[in-house]
Amino acid sequence: MKNQDQALIFEVSKEGRIGYSLPKLDVEEVKLEDVFESDYIRVEDAELPEVSELDIMRHYTALSNRNHGVDSGFYPLGSCTMKYNPKINESVARFAGFANIHPLQDEKTVQGAMELMYDLQEHLIEITGMDTVTLQPAAGAHGEWTGLMLIRAYHEANGDFNRTKVIVPDSAHGTNPASATVAGFETITVKSNEHGLVDLEDLKRVVNEETAALMLTNPNTLGLFEENILEMAEIVHNAGGKLYYDGANLNAVLSQARPGDMGFDVVHLNLHKTFTGPHGGGGPGSGPVGVKADLIPYLPKPILEKTENGYHFNYDRPEAIGRVKPFYGNFGINVRAYTYIRSMGPDGLRAVTEYAVLNANYMMRRLAPFYDLPFDRHCKHEFVLSGRRQKKLGVRTLDIAKRLLDFGYHPPTIYFPLNVEECIMIEPTETESKETLDGFIDKMIQIAKEVEENPEVVQEAPHTTVIKRLDETMAARKPVLRYAKPAPVQV
């Protein structure tokens, strides 16, 4: 039943079928022509589906059964921290005092919400070792861009207009160079060494008087802790640059180490990842940015302050980069993150990291005999395998990922980071049990054996899903982005 083909909602449509009947109009009717110019008014009715309420419910329920989420199964997507989202978060986010307020209300009427925001900022300051935090950015890449704009404002305020280059490692998230470009910087790549860490000699080579910042994830995207981080910070700071922390992998160091203590000047966090805001369906996210004291003047306005008279938003920020989002950030996700932090406490957050690292190392060691391990050393919250061995037998990493679908697992991240051939990046998170990990590991081992004994099974996977293999070339070159009503059948 679950894998049956599903008609489009347009194909279910029957002319004249009604889902809802609206009550009789009890206010004066307004003609569209009196409100909009003719250029904005349709000449013909939109071709919308005409379906009943039951049709709608069955259609979208059937589609939802095809989806894979954290609540339905293991989701080892590397560098995405697809951990379980506790349902207490949802209960708190639905409190009337949080769910039914409006950002344009008088500050005096939303002091409770403002108190939560302020306390969340204080918790994030303590967790990161920064001096203050803004909650405005909507998600990770938005946080990156905001942090880079702060760095740009800092350099320009100091008359340093020639700092136009941002350094990123060859293992960096793709959003890092993209954010740097959008912020007006040129991206310079620093190489990794044979241990998977930033090559210090290459860093010294690329750092100069044009360096605005070095963007790092620590641990990096290979799941390896940059053990030379203090020396790296010194190299960048001595050259007049700033050190930027991409918080994508913060789950690996919670209550164990703080970016601020490593020498970072700016940090963005992904509350929808590390702090259990639900994600994976396109948002919303939350990407707060923390900074050291010398960058505070440039934070987006307003900033939330606490006084003896309560909480208020301070707009008197002459050096601020301006707003980066309407109002005050994605409040609902921030409520969920606050709930998670308060329910876990310092000891709970420390345990998060301990179990995340334990799970990743357990999986890595069990899978290492069957797949290549590019960096054979202790990992943090995630690890990287390579399908080079399988590729020599005619099976690609993509095929392995497709085969996992047959067993009900969401595949790991593949072909990223780019500096590992046939890359398979796995992040189990701390919320998964040993039994769950073993089940996934057993299937990965089975696939490795199938590659050796019956490679066609893997090459032609998936076998049990509704959609098999897409024509990816055609999808990229000639995408079908809207429904086209079939032409009438000629009799």
UniProtKB/Swiss-Prot annotation:
- Catalyzed reaction equations: N(6)-[(R)-lipoyl]-L-lysyl-[glycine-cleavage complex H protein] + glycine + H(+) = N(6)-[(R)-S(8)-aminomethyldihydrolipoyl]-L-lysyl-[glycine-cleavage complex H protein] + CO2
Domain of life of the source: Bacteria
State its cofactor.
pyridoxal 5'-phosphate
Q: Name one GO biological process term.
A: glycine decarboxylation via glycine cleavage system
InterPro entries associated with the record: GcvPB, GDC-P_C, GDC-P_N, GDC_P, PyrdxlP-dep_Trfase, PyrdxlP-dep_Trfase_major, PyrdxlP-dep_Trfase_small
Q: Answer whether the UniProt record assigns the keyword Oxidoreductase to this protein.
A: yes
Gene Ontology CC: cytosol; glycine cleavage complex
Pfam families recorded:
GcvP2_C, GDC-P
* Residue numbers bearing the N6-(pyridoxal phosphate)lysine modification: K273
List the HAMAP family.
GcvPB
**Family recorded in the similarity comment:** Belongs to the GcvP family. C-terminal subunit subfamily.
Name of protein:
Probable glycine dehydrogenase (decarboxylating) subunit 2
Q: Which organism is it from?
A: Bacillus anthracis
